[in-house]
Design a protein with these regions (language model features):
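Hydrophobic cores of alpha-helical transmembrane segments in multi-pass integral membrane proteins
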Residues: 2-89, 98-225, 232, 239-251
Length: 251
């Protein structure tokens, strides 16, 4: 009990405000979409609330990340206004916030991050600060990867209720997942150990994944949202795939 009291007493007003926003967001999502949720979806939503709060309290940069991703995703959803054709006419959707645009920017920024990490690793003097720029670019890339994932989820349901699904069902979607999870784990360890020595090597792995993602997109038109095959229409997939790639990314 004393440990719990000490833990909660260390929370700032910003921590509690973030927790309130997460709870409010979950309540809104439940009220608006509960008709489309089965019991497993509702269970995952309930479990996601304390998990998101705990992670943001554990590592405060995640709080900023979650808020920015939520704000940009909501901006995209409001801008679509239920009509996917607006993705070709609304400037910020067409060039930044539609799922394909956000993921393309993610790809470019991960490549740039890798380049700056490598330059910074071998540079001396002021040029060594380029590793810091690589770190910042990686953060922006992670943000856009998450925005692209959230918006793709929305776009799927706008195409059709039987087509929409959590975007972790094919190689295109899971390589996006792998890229941002790997980068985010690295950024956590970078902050914890206060060194960017491994940045060039980790981001090289991420860039390789992004390279495959782009090749697969060009060869297979993998960016197109397709309905789930029957074998993947399971609540277990919603847990199994992210858990797998959390393991891959942390490894």
């Amino acid at each position: 009990l004393a440990l719990s009291e000490g833990y909660f007493s260390r929370r700032t007003w910003g921590d509690w405000l973030f927790a309130l926003l997460v709870v409010a967001g979950a309540v809104f999502a439940f009220q608006r979409y509960h008709g489309a949720m089965d019991v497993y979806d509702k269970g995952i939503l309930v479990a996601a609330v304390p998990t998101a709060i705990w992670l943001a309290w554990l590592w405060r940069p995640l709080r900023t990340l979650m808020l920015v991703v939520a704000a940009l995703s909501l901006l995209a959803i409001v801008s679509y206004d239920g009509d996917l054709r607006r993705g070709d006419t609304v400037f910020w959707l067409k060039y930044f916030l539609s799922s394909q645009s956000a993921i393309l920017w993610m790809s470019v920024l991960f490549f740039m991050s890798t380049i700056f990490y490598w330059i910074g690793m071998f540079a001396r003097g002021p040029a060594a600060a380029l590793e810091g720029l690589g770190s910042k670019l990686a953060w922006v890339a992670v943000t856009l990867a998450l925005v692209g994932t959230m918006v793709r989820w929305y776009e799927g349901y706008q195409i059709g209720a039987d087509i929409g699904h959590i975007p972790v069902s094919n190689l295109y979607e899971v390589f996006v997942l792998f890229s941002w999870i790997t980068a985010l784990f690295y950024l956590y360890y970078e902050a914890q150990y206060k060194t960017r020595a491994m940045g060039a090597f980790v981001m090289l792995v991420v860039s390789a994944a992004v390279g495959f993602l782009l090749w697969y997109t060009l060869v297979r038109d993998a960016q197109e949202i397709q309905p789930l095959i029957p074998a993947l229409k399971s609540w277990w997939m919603k847990l199994h795939v992210p858990a797998n790639f959390i393991g891959y990314g942390s490894f």
